[in-house]
């Protein structure tokens, strides 16, 4: 099937915001007005089209980014709905990587909220042009102008109003279009309510004139001819204004601001017009850089069907009907179902089975896809998030995505053997879908350990295990990954002798054990000369050492950064064996760790708290009570940014406590920084708990 829309007529955009700003409702209205969805889904009824996982519908939050295609004014819109919760920023990050533009939705009452800041910074990182939609203008306390000021103060944005609200709270009835200089008024709140263009109300005429002047002045900055004409007293006409706003958005010179109430069906159609008029097409975004698979030199791929094929996998989902679905953004060339592609990131061949166009969780089979398309592929075996798929004859590796390290872990124990099997399958699927979620096995207890970005992140994963995969399991409390370390050099001479009737056991080892450089890990060297310990027994020595190093001597945690030298020993012709040397070295190392002053190490997190100034004292006091060390603070807009180093053990439950004592106005990020010795009093508690 040939291309139905020119690449210039595509708009690949995401809807991003803080949790509860009305992002999913806005998307639902867009789908309704573009004719894709004939029954509107309300989030608070748990029926939104884009929120199709049970966990999302219950919690009223969006967890996975669903992709959907719709049409407006003969343009093809590919929308990615993204989550707004801090534990799911990975979803936002990977959506932004493949978008050309974004609509940032603000809650008219709350303005720029913590997660808005995070998402805005991520959009800056990927240079994503955006327009702002101030939603919930019908809410008590909604303040359009405070929201505009927030964009300047809190995210250093450059807002320029394209609309002003008419009325507020319960009396919100429409908007003033500053380009047309007309009032757009909706006749009711019902779905598909009609709107009419009217003269601007007299009481708002002066304000409208003032903001139109600001808009014109921002626009003419984009074009020398328009600036010259304006200085000569000629204002740009409507078409010129739209062209100049479009230029400004593409250059990220300013951020156009619109307003409305998605829930009350006001302001959605003008928002769709703004997406079409101002957000870039793939052609506007231009070429993408990559690395040539063979020569490793930089190459470019232009957004054209004639270029060699390349696309990026940005999300993997498990679908009960189709199996694994891989969401991909095509940057260049075209692809047909059945095509053989190269996964250049992993050097694996992949065959495209079914190719699907997604609408939330409905799907439509397609045979061909082109540059600019966002498609879902079924049947890929080895592809993971962030991988490049391309034409094997012109292979390229596109820029990879960066994923943060998990900071929290819980143990999971299946209740039966059948659950054990289901758990294995489910976890491998979940880990493939989400790169910030890791799975490992504890070598001592054999328990399965889940690692993630935060408590809600792991809660949702456990919920999916229980509901979607029907795994019955016991879930442990969140745990800290402690380590043990030797503090001083020590020498041990140990003899293992056991005589029972028949063959006995005999082995003597002399070890020098000392701390290694931080991060250097474990090193073993045999310095035996003259056969004091025969070569065939040295692996037995190493096996004994390893068994102690994996579990330490204090509380069952691995020993890190240690050097062991075998410098002497003795054996017996009849009674010595590899097993005897294993037992001797195990006992020798345990003794060395005791004599050498083993200590516990704990992970220390780099924590950044962004808080309104009123709460700074409370935040610092609370961090100090968690054994935190304040590293410094500075202002960001009107918020205070506090940097601290805090042991992970003291950060469990922090997100909820921070929210409660700052009324949800502070937010924080944390990532692993280094391991540090646990103070003696704390270490005694840890040993008592785990030993």
Curated annotation (Swiss-Prot):
GO molecular function: GTP binding; GTPase activity; translation elongation factor activity
Cross-referenced PANTHER family: RIBOSOME-RELEASING FACTOR 2, MITOCHONDRIAL, TRANSLATION ELONGATION FACTOR G-RELATED
Pfam families with a match to the protein in the record: EF-G_D2 (PF22042), EFG_C (PF00679), EFG_III (PF14492), EFG_IV (PF03764), GTP_EFTU (PF00009)
UniProt cross-references to HAMAP family, sorted A to Z: EF_G_EF_2_B
Protein name in UniProt: Elongation factor G
Binding site for GTP: 17-24, 81-85, 135-138
Gene Ontology cellular component terms for the protein in this record: cytoplasm
SMART domains the record matches: EFG_C (SM00838), EFG_IV (SM00889)
Localization: Cytoplasm
